[in-house]
Each structure stands twice: as structure tokens, then as C-alpha cells.
């Protein structure tokens, strides 16, 4: 009997020893973006049992690249700026989790920063795997001028990353690319506002020696922020298939974030003080505010807003007010707690549609194409959505100026929003997650 009990105890001990804690994941956003881009993907990882305290997201101070990497430009960052901030986030993740290595997941420019970190900043010693999503590894264009540009495939930076082996010994690497809809991997760049002959191909994001996967029909951002991309990165990182492909809701998520703004025309992730942040619950099936603001505070020098406890079945309006200008973000019900709900104070602008009801329909995690993405307003297809190659992440829709608002839908996501009649004083944003 004792021998049998001992055998059972040993078997349990062996199984327990085999259950290793996963390496923490650091998510790395792209050009002009911020850490909030990863809210959906992080929610999917958590919903599949990945420990929430081992999921990190870097927030680059000045996320937009310089025109010339070695020439200082206000509100923009160099490749060294980027890799320095990534290195600091990795160091923090290792210290807090006591892990030996991390996994890095990067979108677009974030993938280039990951490669720079692995190759030139000692990152290969502390990284077990890397996933590069829509990263222009061979350039957005490859031309003979502007060789100090970060995105030039013939330039100094990318040639340095690609010479010799395109992957790094000891680090498992996967790339995700589109078959033909990535705006930054186009032989003809005119639709994206680039050269007619870019010198790059649809295969540009792939790397020799990596596991290269194609997501057919995906646009540039969907290669990082879509459920399809999640399933691929989850299997690559964990070695098993994800069970949940939708975010599992908490009853009362706790939400907070940072108010950010602009430096000239460049979006930054620097905190903005003196912004009044109000969070209003909306009546079900309407964009009408239901009662007083659930949260009402003015940001201090830290720019931090929240935390606020929400109901995951209720839609909310997140209103920013500063210097007589309002920005209202209408979002679908927030399913899980996050400290990454950063809200950008978009500057006031002249409004050519003043006097009519209109909304800014925004899709930060993807792009729009009328032939592919059926955006409906009150059940009818909108005529304002851009068509063709998906290159735009927002568009202005003219809608009825109703007090109760209109219903906007895309890919199963529904958001009620109250239109604006003058964007110069109040910008109304439908902020889609997927």
C-alpha cells in the first residue's frame, strides 16, 4: 500500500514539474501607434489561460519614425530610440516575473525594432521566440535615394538587418504576411501614396530561415490584431491550439489608461495634463447617456485616467474635454480589465460637413475596404466607406443627426454613437476594436 501511494506521489510530482510557467510576452506596436492596439489580442491570450501578469506591452514615447534615421526630428524617433525603450520594457518584464527569457510579438515597425534588438542590442540572449506581423522586413520601398530612411529596403538600416542570416541563432521566429492586401508590401505603391514601382513584393515581410505564414485577405494591421493572427501566434508561442477565439468577459472589468496627444502633426504617447475625462453609461440600444458620468476627473501631469469599474454588458461614451474642444469615443462594451485604454486628444479641425450629422468611423486594429468590410449604419450599407485596397483606418460618415444616435456594425461588432454637427467643437468617434 505504501509503495502504491509513493508511486502515485512521484507521478504527481513529475507531472507538476512538467507544467512550466510560460515565458512572458512583450507586445511591440508599430509606427504612429500605441500599446492600446494590443487590448484585443491580450484579452484573447488571457481568455485562453495565459497568465495576465506575464503579458506586457511597450508604449513608445514618440512612435513615428524620422524621415532620416540619424537626423533629429521633433516628435519622432530613431531606430536607437525605439530599441532602447524596448530593451527597458524587456528588462522590467524579466525582473518582475523572474523569467530568464521573453517572447516578443511585433506589429509592422515594431517587428523591425525587435530584429534590431535581437541583432544589435543583445536581445538574443533573453528572447526565446519572436513573431513579426506585417513587418516590412525588406522595405516599404527599395530605392536608391533616402538611404538613411528606416523603411527603405536598400537603406543602411534594413541592409544591416538582412545581411548574412536574416534570422538570429537561438531564437525561434515566425512572420505573418498577407497574400496581397498589405498596404506596405505592394509592388505598385500608388494606392498607399507611395512610388508606382516600389521595388518590393507581396513576399517582403517573409524572412529566410523563419516560419513564414500567409493570412489570405488580411490587411496590414489585421496581420497583428485579428483573431486569425492570434490563433497563429498562440500556437507558435505555446505549442498548442487556442480554445477560445473570442474574449471571455469579466462581469465588472476595471479600466484605466493614459490621455495622449500630438506634437505638431505627429501623434505621441506623451501624457497630456488638464484634460477632463468623463465616462458615461449609455442606454441599451441607444447612444443616449443614462444618468450622470460614472467617472469625472481632470488629468494631472501623469496623464493617467481611471481606474473605473465598468459593466461588461453596457456600452460607454468616453469623453475628453480641453480648451473648449470635446472628443467622444464610443466603444462596444469592454469585456475585460485593462490598463491600456489610452485615449488620444485629437486636435480641433475645420469641418467641411458642419451642420450635418456625421461620425468618424475608426478601426485602429485594421483598415477599411467597402468590397471586403461591410460597414452598416442602422442596418444599411454606408456609401462613405472607402473602396479598393484597404489603406485607410478611418472615414467620415454622414448620418441622421438623432439624439439617440445611430447603430454602427462591422464584423459582428455593434456600437451606438451620437453624431456631431461640428467636428471643430466636438469630434464623435466610433472606435471599433476588431
Cite the ranges covered by each PLM segment:
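Short beta-strand/loop motif that positions the catalytic acidic residue
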Residues: 175-177
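Hydrophobic beta-strand segments
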Residues: 265, 270-282
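The serine-hydrolase catalytic nucleophile loop
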Residues: 35-41
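Sec-dependent N-terminal signal peptides
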Residues: 3-14
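Preference for solvent-exposed, low-hydrophobicity sequence contexts
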Residues: 263-265, 283-296, 300-434
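Serine-dependent carboxylesterase/thioesterase catalytic core
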Residues: 25-31, 42-46, 51, 57-167
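Beta-strand-rich domain onsets/edges
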Residues: 234-254, 263
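Catalytic histidine-centered segment of alpha/beta-hydrolase-like enzymes
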Residues: 218-226
Amino acid at each position: 500500500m505504501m509503495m502504491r501511494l509513493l508511486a502515485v506521489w512521484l507521478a504527481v510530482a513529475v507531472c507538476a514539474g512538467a507544467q512550466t510557467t510560460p515565458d512572458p510576452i512583450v507586445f511591440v506596436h508599430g509606427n504612429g501607434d500605441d500599446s492600446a492596439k494590443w487590448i484585443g489580442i491580450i484579452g484573447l491570450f488571457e481568455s485562453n489561460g495565459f497568465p495576465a501578469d506575464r503579458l506586457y506591452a511597450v508604449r513608445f514615447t514618440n512612435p513615428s519614425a524620422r524621415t532620416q534615421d540619424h537626423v533629429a526630428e521633433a516628435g519622432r524617433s530613431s531606430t536607437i530610440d525605439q530599441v532602447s525603450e524596448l530593451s527597458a520594457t524587456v528588462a522590467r518584464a524579466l525582473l518582475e516575473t523572474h523569467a530568464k527569457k521573453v517572447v516578443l510579438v511585433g506589429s509592422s515597425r515594431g517587428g523591425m525594432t525587435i530584429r534590431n534588438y535581437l541583432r544589435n542590442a543583445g536581445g538574443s540572449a533573453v528572447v526565446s521566440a519572436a513573431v513579426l506581423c506585417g513587418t516590412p522586413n525588406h522595405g516599404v520601398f527599395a530605392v536608391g535615394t533616402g538611404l538613411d530612411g528606416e523603411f527603405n529596403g536598400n537603406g543602411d538600416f534594413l541592409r544591416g538587418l538582412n545581411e548574412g542570416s536574416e534570422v538570429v541563432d537561438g531564437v525561434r521566429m515566425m512572420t505573418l504576411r498577407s497574400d496581397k492586401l498589405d498596404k506596405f508590401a505592394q509592388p505598385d505603391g500608388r494606392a498607399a501614396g507611395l512610388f508606382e514601382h516600389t521595388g518590393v513584393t507581396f513576399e517582403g515581410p517573409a524572412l529566410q530561415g523563419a516560419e513564414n505564414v500567409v493570412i489570405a485577405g488580411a490587411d496590414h494591421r489585421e496581420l497583428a490584431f485579428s483573431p486569425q493572427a492570434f490563433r497563429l501566434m498562440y500556437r507558435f508561442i505555446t505549442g498548442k491550439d487556442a480554445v477560445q477565439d473570442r474574449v471571455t468577459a469579466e462581469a465588472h472589468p476595471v479600466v484605466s489608461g493614459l490621455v495622449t496627444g500630438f506634437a505638431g502633426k505627429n501623434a505621441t504617447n506623451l501624457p497630456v495634463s488638464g484634460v477632463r475625462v468623463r465616462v458615461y453609461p449609455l442606454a441599451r440600444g441607444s447612444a443616449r447617456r443614462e444618468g450622470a458620468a460614472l467617472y469625472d476627473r481632470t488629468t494631472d501631469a501623469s496623464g493617467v485616467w481611471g481606474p473605473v469599474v465598468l459593466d461588461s454588458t453596457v456600452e460607454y461614451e468616453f469623453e475628453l474635454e480641453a480648451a473648449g474642444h470635446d472628443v467622444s469615443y464610443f466603444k462596444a462594451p469592454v469585456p475585460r480589465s485593462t490598463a491600456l485604454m489610452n485615449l488620444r486628444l485629437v486636435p480641433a479641425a475645420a469641418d467641411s460637413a458642419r451642420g450635418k450629422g456625421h461620425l468618424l468611423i475608426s478601426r485602429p486594429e485594421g483598415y477599411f475596404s467597402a468590397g471586403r468590410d461591410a460597414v452598416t449604419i442602422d442596418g444599411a450599407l454606408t456609401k462613405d466607406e472607402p473602396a479598393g485596397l484597404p489603406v485607410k483606418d478611418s472615414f467620415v460618415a454622414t448620418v441622421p443627426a438623432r439624439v439617440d444616435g445611430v447603430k454602427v456594425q462591422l464584423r459582428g461588432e455593434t456600437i451606438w454613437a451620437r453624431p456631431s454637427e461640428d467636428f471643430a467643437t466636438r469630434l464623435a468617434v466610433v472606435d471599433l476594436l476588431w
